[in-house]
Amino acid sequence: MTLSISIFTEPRKADVEIIEIKGTGHPDTVCDNIAEEISKDYSRYCLDTFGFILPHMIDKIGVLGGLSNCEFGKGEIVKPITILLNGRLSKNLGDREIPVEQIAMSAIKNVLNRIFLLLNVDKYVIVQNNLHYSRGPGVVLVPDQNNERYDYYTPKAAQGVMHARKDALCNDTSVVVGYAPELIGERIARDLEAMLFSRQFKASYPFVGTDIKIMLVRTEKHISITCCIPFICVYTPSLEFYKIQKEALKNLITYFLQTSHPDLSFEVFLNTRDNYEKPDLYLTVIGGAIESGDEGLVGRGNRSNGVINVTAPMSIEAYSGKNPVHHVAKVYSFVAQKIAREIYAKSGFSAEVYLVSQMGRSIHDPWKIVIKIVGVLNPDLD
């Protein structure tokens, strides 16, 4: 392990922030949630059954949007949504079979039912099962095979499972980053998202779907926000209703922001593509674009900290669906963020923490650690 610490006396320029959040109903976020749910359920099954987690990677989930017809007061899905179940899950340990398809299908259904309350999953969702058990590159076939990767996803015994050992090895050569503190733009975007997905909001605005997107641009003390908020057609009886409620939502968001941060100025835009003459509106059957052709993939959405902040250091590795034992993007993402937050909590200095892995190296021993700190470092700081 090599540790490098750089200390800067000038803070990172923080007068501009650009933050994006993809809500729970966005196709990319749907894929992230499905992948993570499958990994968690599979890991829990393995821990309960074997005492350790078997090799798996389910981080390539995709979705192909369906087709819907929307009218004021009613709508229907006319072509089903397709979930691409891509990835690898160990299907057995010796003679003990693991119900991988059942685990995956149950997780998919649970996620979709949780996000889209009006979606009939059994009727309008197709799952294309692309699970496989290929061992991956690196196994040279020789007599008296002794490479534990030969049966990587079909292990014959516990002693042949690298995940059962304490010295788990990194699955990839990669880099992740964590930083602290989050700036005001991130906090505002998170607070707005939390408000729009709160139980109180849902109870007051049942016509609002879950495929909400927030784009925030802060320039010093002025913040511009564009929100894309879907309306559910069965709860939207007319164009006039849509117009009135859209304006009400805009006013609500503006009021929420201004009362929470009176020292800042705000301008709010909502559903900017709307054309009342055509009409072309963000009107949906179940509350998301997934019903009408929009595709999604794991890793294209929010980072592990819940936002997409292109004005801060950002990991490009997907973390959803990664194996929690040795997948760098899963393990190091949380470790890097934890270190950065602890540095900030103890010193008051902003910090960026970069963890670089090396394939085949112990995950407990990062290849390189790079830490950037803004401030005068106290030599007595632990």
Question: What is each stretch, according to the model?
Answer:
Residues 44, 48-124:
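Glycine-rich, N-terminal phosphate-binding loop and its surrounding beta-alpha-beta segment
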Residues 108-239, 245, 253-257, 261, ...:
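Glycine-rich, mobile lid/loop segments that gate access to catalytic sites or pores
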Residues 317-353, 373-379:
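C-terminal structural cap/anchor segments
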Residues 1-53:
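N-terminal, positively charged regions that mediate nucleic acid binding
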Residues 277-329:
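Long, contiguous, structured domain-core segments that constitute the functional module of a protein
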